[in-house]
């Protein structure tokens, strides 16, 4: 699914490792989500939204599949 994770991360000057540590996941998971190879679980999507202060649908777009 399309997402804005890479853009939001870059706006904060965070590396993939920084974001992974903040979310409690592996860097490989962040890479896979950013490349749209992996859709995050609902709990992880909520954590991402909370971390960036946005709604899930503002970050992840299930209507616009990759």
Name each model feature, range by range:
Residues 25-38:
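Recognition helix of helix-turn-helix/homeodomain-like DNA-binding domains
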Residues 18, 29, 58:
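Residues in the helix-turn-helix
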Residues 37-50:
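Short, basic-rich loop-to-helix N-cap that marks the start of a DNA-contacting helix
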Residues 50, 60-66:
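Short, charged recognition helix plus adjacent turn
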Residues 4-22:
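Short basic helix-loop element that most often maps to the first helix and adjoining turn
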């Amino acid at each position: 699914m399309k997402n804005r994770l890479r853009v939001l991360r870059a706006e904060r000057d965070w590396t993939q490792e920084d974001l992974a540590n903040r979310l409690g996941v592996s860097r490989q998971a962040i890479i896979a989500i950013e490349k749209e190879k992996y859709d995050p679980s609902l709990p992880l999507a909520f954590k991402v939204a909370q971390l960036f202060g946005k709604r899930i649908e503002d970050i992840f777009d299930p209507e616009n599949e990759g």
